[in-house]
Amino acid sequence: MSRSLKKGPFCDEHLMKKVEELNKNDEKKIIKTWSRRSTIFPNFVGHTIAVHDGRKHVPVYITDDMVGHKLGEFVPTRTYKGHIKNEKTSKVRN
């Protein structure tokens, strides 16, 4: 479900302040954040933001194509290891 157009995009204030501070000083540091819900704005492009996936921070380099999406879209929270093959049934069939 998309957000109402009258509300506009959302970005956490602390994240926006950190990015603006780095842009003002022309620095490129990794920014740690737990805010997966924040929308990526054009002034984020070129920065690396470490987004929390529930157990660690995963670095994400922001490009032009990511503008308008949420930070959490680029960091999966679950790891799928596939279905475990049952060796007994495979031996019987062969």
UniProtKB/Swiss-Prot annotation:
GO MF annotations in UniProt: rRNA binding; structural constituent of ribosome
Record flagged with keyword rRNA-binding: yes
Keywords, in A-Z order: Ribonucleoprotein, Ribosomal protein, RNA-binding, rRNA-binding
GO biological process, one term: ribosomal small subunit assembly
InterPro entries the UniProt entry points to: Ribosomal_uS19, Ribosomal_uS19_bac-type, Ribosomal_uS19_CS, Ribosomal_uS19_SF
Function according to Swiss-Prot or TrEMBL: Protein S19 forms a complex with S13 that binds strongly to the 16S ribosomal RNA.
Name recorded for this polypeptide: Small ribosomal subunit protein uS19
UniProt organism field: Finegoldia magna (strain ATCC 29328 / DSM 20472 / WAL 2508) (Peptostreptococcus magnus)
The gene coding this protein: rpsS
